[in-house]
Swiss-Prot record:
Gene3D superfamilies in the record: Cytidine Deaminase, domain 2
Molecular-function GO terms, alphabetical: metal ion binding; metallopeptidase activity
Organism, as annotated: Pseudoalteromonas translucida (strain TAC 125)
Pfam families: RadC, UPF0758_N
Coiled-coil regions listed in the entry: none
Keywords recorded for this protein, A-Z: Hydrolase, Metal-binding, Metalloprotease, Protease, Zinc
Keyword flag Phosphoprotein: no
BP-aspect Gene Ontology terms: proteolysis
Name recorded for this polypeptide: UPF0758 protein PSHAa2643
Keyword Protease recorded: yes
Assigned protein family: Belongs to the UPF0758 family.
Residues that, per the record, bind Zn(2+): 173, 175, 186
Chain span(s) of sequence motif JAMM motif: 173-186
InterPro entries with a match to the protein in the record: MPN, RadC_JAB, RuvA_2-like, UPF0758, UPF0758_CS, UPF0758_N
Length: 224
């Protein structure tokens, strides 16, 4: 069925204007993004087909460019548009979280870090600088690559924490493999950093490893 054959109340764009975005299904929202269908398949049917093929929005949105463009009705232009929309959404959420963030529980930190590190293909080491009330001053990626004593420099971490007037810090890094278990190298570098920061009266509250949708807290495991 052609989209133009549907009453206005069933056309995604008109439905959104009338009822708001929350009233639309996943397929209808995706159809607005896609804009056009294919011969013999209107845009809503195409959107539903893509959702069925990918099983979840997460799978569709996190597909590589090659995987994305290989799918029916998609191409480089759509991939670029989607990545731009996702990045804008993430920056908006980061802005909201950063403005309101008070890290008084591991779960609050998990939510923030999962948003920050979702989809990263490279291992990174991030520091959250906190004030005396555990409010976020700033987050910063200090190091890239495998986290060990050769790639994470305590002197640089201390320097950055002092520069940001931090009363406390939380370390975080990701495991792109999706396995969040801490390695022996993770434990050793955390201990070195904790000792270095103690010399300037800055508390290390936690070190959190993000692996996919899972997080592991050193503090909860008694490692800090």
């Amino acid at each position: 069925m052609q989209l133009t054959s549907l009453p206005n109340s069933q056309r995604p764009r008109e439905k959104l204007i009338e009822k708001g975005a929350k009233a639309l299904s996943d397929a209808e929202l995706l159809a607005i993004f896609l804009r056009t269908g294919l011969p013999g398949m209107n845009v809503i049917e195409l959107a539903q087909h893509l959702l069925n093929e990918n099983k979840t929005l997460h799978n569709l949105f996190n597909a590589s460019m090659e995987e994305f463009c290989a799918q029916k009705g998609l191409g480089t232009a759509k991939y670029v548009q989607l990545q731009a929309v996702l990045e804008l959404s993430q920056r908006y959420m980061q802005e909201r979280c950063q403005r309101d963030a008070i890290f008084n529980s591991p779960n609050a930190v998990y939510d923030y870090l999962t948003l920050q590190m979702r989809g990263l293909q490279q291992e990174v080491f991030m520091v959250l600088y906190l004030d005396s009330q555990n409010r976020l001053i700033k987050d910063e990626i200090l190091f890239y690559g495998t986290i060990n004593s050769a790639s994470v420099y305590p002197r640089e971490v201390v320097k950055a924490a002092l520069k940001n007037n931090a009363a406390a810090v939380i370390f975080a890094h990701n495991h792109p493999s999706g396995i969040a278990e801490p390695s022996q190298a993770d434990k050793l570098i955390t201990n070195k950093l904790q000792q270095a920061l103690q010399l300037v009266d800055i508390n290390v509250l936690d070190h959190i490893i993000v692996g996919g949708e899972t997080c592991v807290s050193f503090a909860e495991r008694g490692l800090i």
